[in-house]
């Protein structure tokens, strides 16, 4: 029996990152809504409890509280952001609105006299104070500590950035240790889970495979499953996992919606039908998709249309299978959280994903999403454990709506053809260019990255078609053609991301090739936006 950590979700966009960090410590955990019953908390028998953040305010939403059993069990509790504030309010402290809200990078003075932060710091001030580089996102602040608590951390604008009652094992921080921007966040969470709570680090991906296979078999029984295969990492791993569970009860449907990458159709069929010996049906629905997208410019409308058409194609194919009752998808957690689909339903919707937002209530198939609670890096780890080839598992992710969300505004076949070729050039150059010692010396990569391709050093890279024209000069003549943007990011979980600092020589070569080889494009720009505030995809 694994030790378990209970994460209570108050509606934060990054709650699942807490689970990701706990799993990285090889400790089993589950996320549940903050309003579960006291009986549920007791029956769960957690080794520790973590309270998530929230976009809500403790003094405006008096119902958003942790169950009383959290405080009665006698197990260690860690509050994060809103979790700290509700801990303060529920245990006799005070929270007030702050006239100096903090969103983004901050430096926190760590008061290292507690077990949680002892010897954990990023640097020390000339006065000898330990400092942490963290990520803040709060508008309220704790102004009075609950009885029995002492100060854990502080900033000039947030005097109580952390607090602790070590006698009861209660700790709380105003910043977010779960996001990668908080440099010592993983160390802090591991300290809490492994040392303070004493949880055993015995949960590994092999356990998840066994549990997922068992769950799929129990859920599906002897019914058939149809899966929409895109060739991307998520749907590929989902297909392999489901195939391991139920074999030929799975039929993969590969839909060519006219918005795929260059030569993707051939690659998908060769890989899945040829190498994996799975049942794959190839459907050319490009005319259907492009026809419905004609004249549509709103990003949400485009995503909804693409999702709707996917469902219609799947339903049509399912009717050809005598026992098809399930529609499987490679939905992963970032898709769910950006669609406001967290377990509490309290997270704010950022944008709809076709996997989770395009399914009508009248869908005649039940939904099977075996990767729904996993992050991209976990999905890759799962794929390797399932025996999938490296080139499949570590291929950059591709959105379900395809180039439809990489063409700003109206989607046209002409635009898709231009974008396909520009994107292929970008990816080809990334694959063919290796990081050098000079790149490392310039801070573009680490010393251990020298010799790796820039494709492997970026988490996701692609081109975006901009429906605007720019004046250029080719030979002795004037041109007036479209603009394309290049986007490359580095991330571990796709919930937050940094733009990739690619070498200028590489970017210059990509730009030169696109302008010279893709007639219809006259200018190339590079996107230097992080996530947040921008999302990785432009639409």
From Swiss-Prot:
One of its GO terms (cellular component) is cytosol. It catalyses: XMP + L-glutamine + ATP + H2O = GMP + L-glutamate + AMP + diphosphate + 2 H(+). It comes from the Bacteria. The active site is at 81 (nucleophile), 176, 178. Keywords: ATP-binding, Glutamine amidotransferase, GMP biosynthesis, Ligase, Nucleotide-binding, Purine biosynthesis. ATP binds at residues 230-236. GO terms for molecular function: ATP binding; GMP synthase activity. SUPFAM superfamilies: Adenine nucleotide alpha hydrolases-like, Class I glutamine amidotransferase-like, GMP synthetase C-terminal dimerisation domain. Pfam families: GATase, GMP_synt_C, NAD_synthase. The keyword Nucleotide-binding applies. Homodimer. Catalyzes the synthesis of GMP from XMP. This is GMP synthase [glutamine-hydrolyzing].
